[in-house]
Amino acid sequence: ACDILKIKDKQLREYLAMPNRVLRVKIPVKMDNGKIRMFTGFRSQHNNDRGPYKGGIRYFDPEGGVKYMEREVMALSSWMTWKCAIVDIPLGGGKGAIFVNPKKEKLSDGELERLTRGFAYKIAEVIGPQKDIPAPDVYTTGKEMTQIMDTWSKMNGNRYSPGVIT
């Protein structure tokens, strides 16, 4: 992207090359069979110079495993920065993922909700209307975004905050 935009300044290129923050979390989820299963999730926040981070949360199980997923999430958060900048939307780039394929693994609705709320709890300190605004992505919908909003709101004084998600 720096080449296309003809950004020559070496320090600026280095600054834009990596996310500001990548949060890696472990999410314990009580499964329907009573056992606890650990999931790994990420939230990459690439750049917020133009406004709050913005980007999807996906359920994702790449063949390369968790390490590949982390790099993918970092790259996708970068793309969100550039997409918002190109169309002059005052938002930065973010992206999140949980290492799971709910279709292949046939997780129940309850298991998915506990997973989503657990992830929201773990990333709550870095998201919010003025910080980072998650959105649906692969295998997530408005249903999961509502669960994230509800969890975040309960952790922030029970204030109704629809602006925490899109």
Q: Language-model segments: what does each one mean?
A:
Residues A1-K26:
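Short, Gly/Pro- and small/polar-rich lid/capping loops
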Residues C2-K6, G55-I57, G96, Q147-I148:
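Non-transmembrane, interaction-prone segments in cytosolic or luminal domains
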Residues R21-K104:
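Glycine-rich, N-terminal phosphate-binding loop and its surrounding beta-alpha-beta segment
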